[in-house]
Regions:
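Cell-envelope/extracellular polymer assembly enzymes that use nucleotide-activated donors
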Residues: 49-52, 82, 225, 240
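Long helical/loop segments within the catalytic core of UDP-sugar-dependent glycosyltransferases
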Residues: 102, 106-109, 115-116, 122-132, ...
Length: 313
C-alpha cells in the first residue's frame, strides 16, 4: 500500500514538473518573440535617481580593479553614482587595488569610498554596513568578480522607473566571464543561459515574479531600511530578501537588457562548495517561508514557496 502510494505520488510530481516546465518555456518563448529585434533603446530617462553601488570584496585582488573600472565607466550620469568598495576581512591586496583605482586621474572627482572592513556577517553584513552609509535612492550590488556591461545600470533604473511605487527592485542577467576556460565552465554557462533566459524570463513574463540574484540588481534604499535590512549571516541573502519583497506586495522587475559578466568556479571542488552553500541557504529560506504556503498571503509568495519546495525537498 505504501509503495503504491509513493509510486503514484512520484508519477504525479513528475507530470506536474513536466507541465510546469512546458508552461514556463512557452512563456519565455513568447517573451523573446516579442523582443526579438534586440534593439538597444537608449532614450533619455525623465529622471535619473542617485544610485549607491556597493561592491563586497573578500580576497579579490585579481579581479577587483577590472570590476571597479567597469562600474565607473558605465553609461550613467557620474554625479548620480556613489561607489562603495568594501575590502571585507581581506588577507591579500584587495584594499590596495581599490586605492590604486581611486588614484587614477580619469576618476578624479568621482564619488568613491573605500572601506577596509573587519566586521562580521559575511556579504549580508557588508550590505548592512553599506545601507548605513548610502546616499542614493537606490542601492546597486555587484560582486567583485562581476563586470557590468556599459548600459547595465541604465537598464536597471529604466525598469523600476516604469512604476517606482510597485517596482522596488530590478535585476538583470549574468553571463559567464570565463565560459571557455574548461568543460565545467562551459556547462555552468549553459546552465545560466537556461536559468536566466528561460526560467527567469518565463516567470516574469507570465506571473510578474522576479528573483534578486547575488549581483547586477538595484533596490530602493528606503524599502530595504523599512524591512530591517539584510539578515546577517544569511547564506543566500538574495533569495531571503526576494521573499520579503514579495510578502510586501511589491515587484522585482526583470531588466532583460542589463548584463554583467561573472567569474564562475573552475574546479569541481569550488563548484561543489558554491552549490552546497546555495542549497543550504535556499533550504533555510524555504523552511522559514513554508508557513506562507497554507496561510493567507500574497499568491506570488505561495507559488515561489511551492516551486522552491519541489526543488529542495
Amino acid at each position: 500500500m505504501v509503495s503504491q502510494f509513493l509510486m503514484i505520488f512520484t508519477l504525479i510530481s513528475i507530470w506536474i514538473s513536466l507541465i510546469w516546465g512546458v508552461v514556463i518555456l512557452v512563456s519565455a518563448v513568447h517573451f523573446w518573440l516579442k523582443h526579438s529585434d534586440f534593439k538597444v533603446d537608449k532614450e533619455e530617462l525623465p529622471y535619473y535617481p542617485k544610485v549607491t553601488i556597493v561592491v563586497p570584496a573578500h580576497n579579490e585582488d585579481v579581479v577587483i580593479s577590472q570590476t571597479a573600472k567597469a562600474i565607473l565607466n558605465m553609461n550613467y550620469p557620474h554625479d548620480k553614482v556613489e561607489l562603495l568598495l568594501f575590502a571585507d576581512n581581506c588577507s591579500d591586496n584587495t584594499y590596495q587595488e581599490c586605492l590604486a583605482v581611486q588614484a587614477l586621474p580619469e576618476y578624479a572627482g568621482r564619488n568613491i569610498t573605500i572601506i577596509n572592513r573587519k566586521g562580521t556577517g559575511g556579504k549580508a553584513g557588508v550590505l548592512n554596513d553599506a545601507l548605513k552609509m548610502a546616499d542614493g535612492e537606490y542601492i546597486c550590488i555587484y560582486d567583485a568578480d562581476a563586470m557590468p556591461e556599459t548600459n547595465a545600470l541604465y537598464f536597471l533604473v529604466k525598469e523600476v522607473m516604469k512604476d517606482p511605487e510597485r517596482r522596488v527592485a530590478s535585476f538583470g542577467r549574468n553571463k559567464t566571464r570565463n565560459a571557455k576556460q574548461n568543460f565545467l565552465t562551459r556547462c555552468i554557462n549553459q546552465e545560466i543561459v537556461v536559468t536566466q533566459r528561460v526560467h527567469h524570463v518565463g516567470m516574469w513574463h507570465l506571473f510578474k515574479i522576479g528573483r534578486i540574484p547575488g549581483t547586477n540588481f538595484i533596490i530602493q534604499t528606503e524599502f530595504v531600511k523599512s524591512i530591517g535590512g539584510w539578515r546577517n549571516g544569511a547564506l543566500t541573502e538574495d533569495t531571503d530578501i526576494s521573499f520579503k519583497i514579495m510578502q510586501s506586495g511589491k515587484l522585482i522587475a526583470l531588466a532583460y537588457n542589463s548584463e554583467a559578466f561573472q567569474q564562475e568556479p573552475e574546479t569541481l571542488k569550488s563548484y561543489y562548495m558554491q552549490r552546497k552553500r546555495w542549497a543550504k541557504g535556499n533550504y533555510e529560506v524555504v523552511i522559514s517561508n513554508f508557513k506562507h504556503l497554507f496561510g493567507k498571503g500574497n499568491w506570488r509568495v505561495k507559488l515561489e514557496v511551492a516551486n522552491y519546495s519541489c526543488i529542495f525537498f
